[in-house]
């Protein structure tokens, strides 16, 4: 009886939350991205107190969840539980919302927020020299995950061994593994400083089949279905919109192409923001799987390293 009443209460809260046009727009904006309160205020040109109220109503209805990233709280769309009798209602709500585009100005504001995040990341890496590796090693040294990524690569069925790419190669430590396996390799980074370090590393190793591109992942949309494999080692937590990264890379992969990601599990080490330039404090496996699925990719092998 209590559960039945709870279901009616939740249904009433959902109806209340979705009975406001702005709250529906907020849910639409949170389709694949997470935003902080101030970012949502910027996107919707709305006062903070009012935005906080709308987010509270959506949270009470179980339509948004929040996660703490250091001193900041980010909101994202809450996925419906398949065990809930309201699963179909919530699923259909999201499907309907996602068929309705946000107004052009809202879209422009979203892109501005992402551009500001990207600028912070680029400023950090532009200021980095050899000291970056020392900081990065404090949280995720290449020696910890490099061999595991190579093993995943060796075990992955690939369309061919023609073209591979690494997004954010750091100082280039994984590029020799790709160079030995593929005919052509692209090292992609939107930081000229970091790309220069990777290039210097490869020159010292006399690797001749690697091209270096100072670009973001929109590069893949300009080279559709070109790559057999794309690798991202400890990069996603530096990106302004992880969902966009998946979409971009999916466009550049050949049919049955492989995307290999090594990433941090969600953690609470806030010092990584200032020391390592992290925008996100790791991710849950379910988040990665959802972004991959939304981009038209399917999950493959997984491995967890302590």
Task: Label the model's feature ranges.
Residues 165, 170-219:
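Class I SAM-dependent methyltransferase SAM/SAH-binding core
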Residues 6-50, 73-80:
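N-terminal helix-turn-helix DNA-binding core of bacterial DNA-binding proteins
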Residues 229-241:
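A short SAM/SAH-binding and catalytic strip from SAM-dependent methyltransferases
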Residues 218-230:
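A short acidic, Gly/Pro-enriched loop at the edge of an enzyme's catalytic core
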Residues 140-161:
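Conserved alpha-helix/loop element of class I SAM-dependent methyltransferases that forms part
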Residues 243-258:
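A short glycine-rich, Lys/Arg-flanked "PGG" loop and its adjoining helix->strand segment in the class I
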Residues 2-3, 82-131:
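Amphipathic alpha-helical dimerization/coiled-coil segments
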Residues 258-306:
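C-terminal alpha-helical "lid/dimerization" subdomain adjacent to the S-adenosyl-L-methionine
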């Amino acid at each position: 009886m209590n559960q039945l009443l709870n279901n009616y209460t939740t249904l009433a809260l959902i109806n209340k939350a979705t009975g406001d046009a702005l709250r529906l727009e907020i849910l639409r904006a949170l389709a694949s991205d997470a935003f902080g309160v101030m970012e949502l205020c910027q996107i919707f040109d709305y006062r903070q107190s009012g935005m906080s109220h709308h987010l509270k109503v959506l949270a009470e209805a179980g339509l948004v969840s929040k996660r703490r990233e250091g001193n900041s709280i980010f909101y994202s769309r809450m996925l419906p539980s398949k065990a809930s009798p309201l699963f179909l209602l919530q699923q259909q709500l999201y499907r309907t919302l996602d068929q309705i585009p946000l107004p052009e100005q809202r879209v422009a504001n979203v892109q501005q927020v992402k551009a500001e995040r990207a600028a912070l990341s680029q400023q950090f890496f532009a200021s980095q020299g050899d000291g970056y590796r020392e900081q990065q090693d404090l949280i995720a040294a290449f020696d910890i995950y490099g061999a595991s990524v190579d093993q995943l690569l060796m075990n992955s069925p690939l369309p061919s061994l023609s073209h591979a790419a690494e997004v954010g190669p750091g100082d280039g430590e994984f590029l020799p593994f790709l160079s030995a396996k593929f005919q052509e390799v692209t090292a992609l980074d939107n930081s000229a400083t970091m790309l220069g370090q990777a290039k210097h590393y490869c020159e010292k190793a006399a690797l001749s089949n690697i091209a270096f591109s100072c670009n973001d992942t929109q590069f893949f949309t300009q080279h559709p279905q070109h790559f057999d494999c794309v690798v991202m080692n400890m990069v996603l937590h530096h990106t302004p919109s992880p969902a966009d990264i998946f979409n971009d890379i999916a466009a550049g992969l050949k049919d049955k192409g492989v995307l290999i990601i090594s990433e941090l599990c969600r953690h609470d080490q806030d010092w990584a923001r200032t020391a390592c330039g992290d925008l996100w404090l790791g991710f849950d496996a379910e988040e990665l799987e959802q972004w991959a699925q939304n981009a038209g990719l399917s999950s493959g092998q997984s491995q967890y390293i302590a």
